[in-house]
């Protein structure tokens, strides 16, 4: 299978490309030069420039984004990369006959559920009186509750995926990603024990997103098999036939 990865030069792109390259042909697009064969430098907001790279591609993994999600980030930074570029990538993929499209969304699309208990307590690391096996989970079919402008742009990317699936016949999986650290560590934020996605699990999860047959449209949550959960990752694992290997709890000091 020939797979095109946008944003291939980042941590997530590199981890996924390294894993998939053992069994697929990998190409990529990045805004900056990347020391990897098959990678082209291009601006995703220029659809005429990027369209030729999609010819003959079987699956697209769209990772490229403005990833800052601070409350004060402006639309001037978010709209070109997270909206215009994303629409261009969907459109170029469809025009080239790409079968499978995997869109990197974010847990932040549902992030305002973390303002409510019991999820607020779990995100803050306050576990007293809570049973991890009894906490209700935020599912993919619950209404989106974006926690900022960044999250709102990711929600739009999911809506584009639904359109291209329902109206254009493309197979689309939107991955509401947890936390992927450059160092593969959890860090000091207690929310990391909910959202941590190990590099090993990340790679195999995206492999399943690309390879699992019979999917028309799905929104899935991506994280490791962490003890404390807010989002319904187990249902996503079942949809993809994926078994995670890691658990953030094993790294708790």
Positions of PLM-derived features:
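Conserved beta-loop-beta element that borders a ligand/cofactor-binding pocket
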Residues: 105, 148, 158-183
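Conserved C-terminal active-site "lid" loop/helix of NAD(P)H-dependent oxidoreductases
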Residues: 218-243
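N-terminal Rossmann NAD(P)H-binding glycine-rich loop of SDR-like oxidoreductase domains
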Residues: 3-23
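Glycine-rich NAD(P)-binding loop of the Rossmann-fold in SDR/ketoreductase-type enzymes
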Residues: 45, 77-85, 107, 152-153, ...
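Conserved Rossmann-fold NAD(P)-dependent oxidoreductase catalytic core, especially the SDR/UDP-sugar
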Residues: 88-144
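Alpha-helical substrate-binding/gating segment
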Residues: 166, 176-184, 196-218, 225
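Rossmann-fold cofactor-recognition segment
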Residues: 31-46
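NAD(P)H-binding glycine-rich loop region in Rossmannoid oxidoreductase-like domains
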Residues: 44-81, 92
């Amino acid at each position: 299978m020939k797979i095109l990865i946008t944003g291939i030069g980042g941590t997530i792109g590199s981890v996924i490309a390294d894993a998939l390259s053992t069994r697929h042909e990998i190409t990529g697009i990045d805004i900056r030069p990347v020391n990897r064969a098959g990678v082209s430098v291009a601006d995703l907001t220029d659809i005429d420039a990027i369209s030729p790279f999609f010819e003959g591609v079987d699956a697209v993994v769209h990772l490229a984004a403005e990833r800052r999600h601070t409350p004060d980030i402006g639309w001037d930074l978010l709209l070109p990369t997270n909206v215009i570029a994303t629409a261009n990538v969907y459109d170029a993929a469809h025009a080239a006959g790409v079968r499978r499209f995997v869109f990197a969304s974010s847990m932040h699309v549902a992030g305002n559920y973390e303002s409510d208990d019991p999820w607020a307590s779990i995100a803050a690391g306050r576990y007293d009186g809570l049973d991890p096996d009894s906490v209700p989970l935020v599912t993919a079919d619950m209404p989106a509750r974006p926690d900022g402008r960044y999250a709102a742009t990711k929600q739009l990317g999911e809506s584009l995926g639904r359109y291209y699936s329902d109206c254009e016949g493309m197979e689309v999986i939107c991955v509401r990603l947890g936390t992927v650290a450059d160092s593969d560590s959890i860090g000091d934020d207690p929310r990391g024990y909910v959202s941590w996605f190990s590099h090993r699990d990340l790679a195999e999860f995206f492999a399943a997103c690309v390879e699992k047959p019979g999917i028309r449209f799905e929104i899935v949550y991506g994280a490791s098999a962490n003890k404390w959960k807010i989002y319904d990752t187990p249902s996503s694992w079942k949809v993809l036939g994926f078994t995670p290997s890691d658990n953030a709890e094993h790294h708790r000091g």
